[in-house]
């Protein structure tokens, strides 16, 4: 990718963080917003706020210009002195920084950014920095070769620094480094543990910036970001806070330096004792670094093809930007795990880190079916085997129970910890609104995901034992409409017994849709689509009776929706059934069918939830 190539038109605002992630490994290298806001993110829920130093020496000067991905910070040595460790040390250090002017950020109007789905590039003056995050279909571990999996699951992204010193009159130093923000591990030199094959820096044993020895001209590790960059000739020392690699580019030359930004954390996930699948092929981060550098050219070609996937699409510039961002964040949330010798595909819910959240699984369904359909089947299989359950249903305000059926949990756990079988980390009992059980929606999500998967792959063998094929999903959906077939509307009308006196909630923030209900806004279209998909499935399989029932429901739903159109086709979202007005959770529990002891427990739960609702979601 040449520096002249335009990827996506960013407009005026080019300063935003973006994820740069390998596939199925969970880590992210975040970069793009000025200041101390990016860095190495290994299973975190937010950017690590790490100083990242990428800069170049001015020609003939002892001054450096750098991309503005770092902020002011105290010299770490101040903590170890007796005379200047008081409150005045911060002011002293700031004055020294300002007077010395050793490292000066580029002005924002000097920087050009070229942003794609896989390649992100910054250019200022004679310095270009490029981050490369290749992505392609993740091979199915059940059928792929060992080398195919090693190549695809390599836990590293790549980087290039290009220094154009063709017009220079002196040798110029470029640097690439970071601030140590790990309270447990110091930054170490990679050549000390690789027999000199790799140079670079590692933060503990989990992250590293690596380069091949044959590829570099000079390396310096320096104490703080400015104490040895002037090239005093003194040997490098062990640093307190920051390290970097310095590269010399002679006058009249243009050079490109390649790096692997590597991650390694083999064993993760509580309860199920899973490990990252890539740990089958890499024993430590040094092996990751050597492999990443050896495969640089192949990975770069994959990244170029990935960029073209989005750039050549018939989308607007805004759409391309959104898709590129979504792909980056998606891969930064993915984990391919191994459990009892079998692959387990996990997609975390961004900063919330809930695992395989079902309402997101259905959102990313078409992308996964395009790139790696086996992951959809893998997720659905785990939902069926571990995170499905059966319930009864009731009308709000009425303790009478009716048959319910099969459904699925909101998620499979949170923050690398699987939840108990049949339960999510999100859903709670005996509450209204957020965090209540989302039984109907997850059932609809399962139907949509399963039917689309079968339609796209024609995997009939997988379908046969599934709830969608057996009719269990259809029975469960119509039971949640109305127990009397003559009163069905194609909408959800009953709540799950799992709400235990509470109310079913849609995954929207309270107040976003004033006066809305789950029936009104979220499930009308999705339920209609699920019924249509099941009708086709049953007809294709010769299940005429089930197909007729599935076909009747979307007709009822469409009639319910269109009956609320105003003159001129204006939609009035008020197709809610007539229901008992909401009462307080406390009074509802007291009047419910539960025993006195159970009522007492649920009232205590309600009081606790009332307090929790005032807190942030995470």
From Swiss-Prot:
Pfam families: Glyco_hydro_52. Keywords: Carbohydrate metabolism, Glycosidase, Hydrolase, Polysaccharide degradation, Secreted, Signal, Xylan degradation. Residues 76-100, 463-509 are annotated as: Disordered. Its EC number is 3.2.1.37. It is found in: Secreted. InterPro entries: Glyco_hydro_52. It catalyses: Hydrolysis of (1->4)-beta-D-xylans, to remove successive D-xylose residues from the non-reducing termini. One of its GO terms (cellular component) is extracellular region. It comes from the Bacteria. Pathway: Glycan degradation; xylan degradation. It is an enzyme of class 3 (hydrolase). Belongs to the glycosyl hydrolase 52 family. This is Beta-xylosidase. It comes from Geobacillus stearothermophilus. The gene is xylA.
């Amino acid at each position: 990718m040449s520096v002249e190539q335009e990827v996506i038109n960013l407009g005026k605002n080019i300063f935003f963080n973006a994820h740069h992630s390998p596939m199925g490994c969970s880590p992210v290298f975040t970069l793009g917003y000025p200041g101390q806001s990016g860095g190495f993110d290994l299973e975190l829920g937010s950017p690590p706020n790490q100083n990242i130093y990428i800069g170049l020496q001015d020609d003939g000067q002892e001054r450096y210009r750098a991309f503005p991905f770092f902020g002011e910070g105290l010299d770490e040595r101040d903590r170890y002195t007796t005379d200047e460790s008081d409150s005045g040390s911060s002011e002293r250090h700031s004055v020294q920084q300002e007077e010395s002017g050793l490292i000066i950020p580029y002005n924002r109007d000097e920087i050009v950014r070229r942003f794609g789905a896989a390649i992100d590039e910054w250019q200022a003056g004679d310095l270009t920095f490029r981050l490369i995050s290749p992505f392609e279909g993740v091979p199915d571990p059940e059928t792929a070769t060992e080398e195919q999996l090693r190549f695809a699951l390599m836990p590293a992204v790549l980087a290039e620094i290009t220094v154009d010193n063709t017009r220079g009159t002196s040798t110029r130093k470029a640097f690439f480094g970071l601030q140590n923000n790990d309270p447990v591990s110091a930054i170490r030199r990679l050549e000390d543990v690789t027999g000199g094959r790799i140079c670079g820096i590692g933060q503990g044993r989990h992250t590293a910036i690596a380069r091949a020895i044959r590829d570099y001209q000079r390396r310096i590790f320096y104490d703080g970001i400015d104490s040895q960059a002037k090239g005093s000739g003194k040997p490098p020392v062990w640093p307190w806070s920051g390290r970097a690699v310095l590269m010399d580019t002679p006058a009249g030359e243009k050079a490109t330096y390649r790096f692997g930004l590597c991650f390694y954390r083999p064993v993760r996930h509580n309860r199920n004792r899973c490990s990252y699948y890539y740990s089958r092929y890499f024993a430590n981060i040094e092996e990751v670094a050597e492999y990443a550098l050896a495969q640089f050219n192949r990975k770069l070609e994959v990244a170029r093809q990935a960029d073209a996937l989005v750039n050549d699409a018939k989308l607007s510039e805004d759409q391309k930007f959104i898709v590129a961002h979504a792909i980056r964040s998606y891969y930064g949330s993915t984990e391919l795990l191994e459990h009892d010798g079998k692959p387990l595909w996990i997609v975390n819910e961004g900063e919330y880190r809930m695992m395989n959240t079902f309402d997101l699984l259905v959102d990313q369904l078409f992308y996964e079916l395009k790139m790696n359909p086996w992951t959809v089947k893998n997720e659905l299989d785990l939902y069926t085997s571990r995170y499905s359950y059966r319930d009864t249903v009731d009308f709000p305000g009425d303790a009478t129970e009716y048959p319910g059926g099969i459904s699925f949990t909101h998620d499979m756990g949170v923050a690398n910890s699987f939840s108990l079988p049949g339960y999510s980390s999100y859903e709670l009992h005996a509450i209204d609104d957020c965090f209540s059980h989302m039984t109907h929606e997850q059932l609809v999500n399962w139907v949509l995901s399963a039917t689309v998967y079968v339609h796209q792959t024609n995997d009939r063998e997988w379908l046969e034992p599934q709830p969608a094929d057996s009719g269990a999903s259809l029975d469960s959906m119509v039971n949640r409409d109305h127990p009397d077939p003559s009163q069905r509307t194609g909408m959800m009308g009953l709540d799950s017994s799992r709400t235990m006196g509470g109310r079913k909630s849609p995954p929207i923030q309270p107040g976003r849709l004033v006066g809305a209900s789950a029936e009104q806004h979220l499930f009308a279209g999705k339920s209609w689509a699920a019924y249509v998909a099941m009708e086709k499935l049953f007809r294709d399989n010769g299940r005429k009776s089930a197909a007729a029932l599935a076909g009747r429901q979307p007709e009822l739903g469409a009639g319910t929706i269109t009956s609320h159109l105003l003159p001129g086709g204006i939609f009035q979202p008020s197709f809610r059934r007539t229901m008992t007005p909401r009462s307080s959770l406390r009074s509802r529990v007291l009047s419910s069918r539960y025993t006195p002891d159970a009522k007492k427990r649920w009232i205590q739960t309600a009081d606790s939830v009332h307090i929790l609702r005032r807190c942030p979601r995470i």
